[in-house]
Regions:
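A glycine-rich, often tryptophan-bearing local segment used as a flexible ligand/cofactor-contacting loop or short
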Residues: 86-178
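Sec-dependent signal peptide recognition
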Residues: 2-7
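Active-site rim elements
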Residues: 29-32, 154, 164-167, 184, ...
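Bacterial Sec-dependent signal peptides at the C-terminal "C-region" and cleavage site
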Residues: 8, 12-23
Length: 298
């Protein structure tokens, strides 16, 4: 009996040991979007889960010398890209590529897929991009049609979106991926931009979520890939086009959406560790109703 009690105490003690937090960095500081809001919303979402410790790497302002901008990627299991601005210095670019090539975890968030149209390796890391002069020379359009991901080499601009509105996301062939496992097949996302006509040279790994870009909302009339993983060497890369930042943290529906935050949290763990240990929360949105977490807290 005494031996059983000791074993039970040891087991309970093991269960109570806190999981080691994941160290991550958000690269930000220049963007055509409201980066002070987006970077803080991402930091709050990750840190308030208790699973992450997040630093901010803030670049010099647009037009200022970039020579001193550096990130020590060796300190991090996770890199979140929230940057669309001036080119990084060569040493920074090479350090990022070394991190990715070594199997690092990367989240490509929203307008980070607008950045660096002439950097070939970056465009393969993000798979799809838009704006900044992208066209048929940047790679094919990719969209979901008749149960398959289509690659369309038609000439035309890369990147557009209609008016911001709530829309339904559908989980596709990545439904059993650890990031999506247990989530509903369809769920309602809060008011947001819906990127369409994105194109690029990269290879989508698991297509996780698509949405219909409704022509009535000035969309493409296609089922657009908005959330996916990217095949690039040993790296674990998650690309989400969701999450247009609002004017303030308090008025930021696309990032206050529970679905956005849950995907971000699960993806961050997967990118860093290759697994997802988080349960599906009770407040996850349904196909009919948006769910919000205004304070960015589970």
């Amino acid at each position: 009996m005494r031996r059983f009690a000791i074993l039970l105490l040891l087991a309970l003690g093991a269960c109570s040991v806190p999981q080691q937090t994941i160290r991550g960095v958000i690269i930000t500081g220049q963007n055509n979007h409201n980066w002070p809001v987006s970077s803080e919303a991402i930091r709050l979402t990750l840190e308030q889960s208790g699973r992450f410790e997040i630093d901010l790497a803030v670049s010099p302002p647009a037009g200022a010398p970039m020579d001193s901008f550096r990130v020590d990627f060796s300190r991090y299991e996770l890199v979140v890209l929230d940057y669309n601005g001036d080119p990084w210095p060569e040493e920074m670019r090479q350090a990022f590529l070394d991190y990715v090539d070594a199997g690092g975890g990367v989240i490509v968030y929203h307008a980070a897929d607008n950045a660096f149209p002439d950097w070939e390796a970056y465009n393969r890391i993000i798979a799809l991009g838009g704006w900044e002069g992208r066209d048929e020379h940047s790679g094919p359009y990719q969209y979901w049609q008749d149960g398959a991901l289509v690659q369309d080499t038609t000439a035309g601009r890369g990147g557009s979106h209609g008016v911001r509105h709530p829309y339904v996301l559908t989980c596709r062939r990545g439904a059993e991926h650890p990031i999506l496992k247990g989530l509903p097949v369809q769920w309602m996302h809060a008011e947001d931009e819906l990127y369409d006509r994105m194109r690029g040279p990269g290879e989508i790994g698991d297509l996780l979520c698509t949405a219909w870009a409704d022509p009535a909302q000035r969309g493409s009339g296609r089922e657009e890939p908005l959330v996916f993983t990217v095949n690039y060497g040993k790296a674990r890369i998650f690309h989400t086009m969701l999450g247009h930042a609002g004017p303030t943290l308090e008025d930021n529906p696309a990032m206050q959406c529970t679905g956005f935050q849950v995907l971000l949290l699960r993806a961050a763990e997967w990118c860093a560790r290759g697994r997802v240990t988080q349960p599906v929360p009770a407040d996850f949105p349904t196909a009919e109703a948006v769910s919000l977490r205004p304070g960015y807290r589970p």
